[in-house]
Swiss-Prot record:
The keyword Ribonucleoprotein does not apply. Transmembrane segments: none annotated. Keywords: DNA replication, DNA-directed DNA polymerase, Nucleotidyltransferase, Transferase. The gene is holA. Belongs to the DNA polymerase HolA subunit family. It comes from Buchnera aphidicola subsp. Acyrthosiphon pisum (strain APS). GO terms for cellular component: DNA polymerase III complex. This is DNA polymerase III subunit delta. NCBIfam families: holA.
């Protein structure tokens, strides 16, 4: 099994275009970007046709069988994208996947996209054949993987940026692949032949602020105090409605409290039960293990007080209380 990260895909394709790729991960932006890159390289190699088959239920596998049956010796080179949207893979689908490897053909380039099933695929021992093929990582990158990806994109766009400005970008936008990509495009357009400083990045962050409350909550759940303060400060400068922050955090904290009470049930089962988005589950798991019950209850009490202060229009005091919340939950 060869894992190819987003910053390595172009180089890999330039070396050799393979006829079978497996996409693991659920980052929508990376899924689309990596797919487009392979499709472009494939087109240049003569794969002029593209077929997309969505597998939403077991019966949809018949569409794949039909695709192979209806193609003859004279059909054009084709890229077949199989997009798994089904909730679970059963035994029959796993067997069909294993049989698929016997159908591989040099004139059919296959992209298998597993989306939310990716973790299951990684752990499943029944899919032994997968280890022989290229796996393209479409998981949202974090830490070093995120830094490497941003470095690659900056080099591709030929952006000149100071080290401090670069790390501010990484620190602030980590986990938000689509938005940072848009920011990089913006930097290239605004300052094409200029060294981008930390001051310019700070200006961009404030002027083009487009972050949801969940992004702020994720940073709290990660225990990143400084980043949480930074995001909160931008919410304050932008005169964001603090009640939205309160309600969003309140909802997530109450879910954490309920999860902690269900001691006999696995955290993974609970995440499924409460319909926590796949992209946010790692943050909930970290908070579940890190934040104790006393801190959670104290935070809920403060949130109630904040809501009262919002109704009384004690707005400046509200933001101080939100800072206090960050300290309680991050430490």
């Amino acid at each position: 099994m060869k894992n190819i990260y987003p910053n390595e895909l172009k180089k890999s394709l330039m070396q050799k275009l393979h006829y079978f790729y497996i996409f693991l991960g659920e980052d929508f932006f990376l899924l689309e970007k990596n797919q487009d890159m392979i499709l472009n390289f494939a087109y240049k190699k003569g794969f002029l046709e593209k077929i997309i088959i969505d597998v939403e239920k077991n019966q949809d596998w018949k569409k794949i069988i039909l695709f192979y049956k209806t193609n003859n010796l004279f059909f054009k080179k084709t890229t077949l994208v199989i997009n798994f949207l089904i909730k679970k893979l059963n035994v029959i689908l796993i067997q069909n996947l294993n049989k698929m490897f016997s159908l591989l053909h040099p004139d059919i380039l296959i992209i298998l996209k597993f989306n939310h099933l990716s973790r299951f695929i990684q752990k499943n021992k029944s899919l032994k054949e997968f280890k022989n093929y290229n796996i393209v990582s479409c998981f949202t990158p974090y830490n070093l993987n995120f830094i490497n990806w941003i470095k690659y994109e900056i080099q591709e766009k030929k952006i000149n940026i100071e080290e401090k400005a670069f790390f501010l970008l990484c620190k602030y936008y980590e986990g938000n692949t689509l938005f940072i990509y848009k920011i990089l495009d913006m930097l290239f357009i605004i300052w094409p032949d200029t060294c981008i400083t930390e001051k310019k990045i700070k200006k961009i962050i404030i002027e083009f602020f487009d972050v949801s409350p969940s992004y702020w909550i994720n940073s709290i759940f990660q225990g990143k105090t400084e980043k949480s303060f930074y995001i909160l400060n931008i919410f304050f400068k932008k005169k964001y409605n603090p009640l939205i922050l309160v309600r969003s955090l309140q909802k997530d904290l109450l879910q954490l409290i309920h999860m902690k009470r269900e001691k006999k049930i696995s955290i993974y089962v609970m995440l499924e039960k409460y319909n926590i988005f796949v992209t946010r589950r790692k943050f909930f798991i970290k908070a579940f293990n890190k934040i104790n019950n006393d801190s959670l209850l104290k935070a809920i009490q403060i949130l109630v007080k904040i809501e009262v202060n919002i109704k009384k229009k004690y707005n400046n005091y509200v933001w101080n209380q939100l800072q206090e919340l960050i300290l309680i939950l991050c430490n």
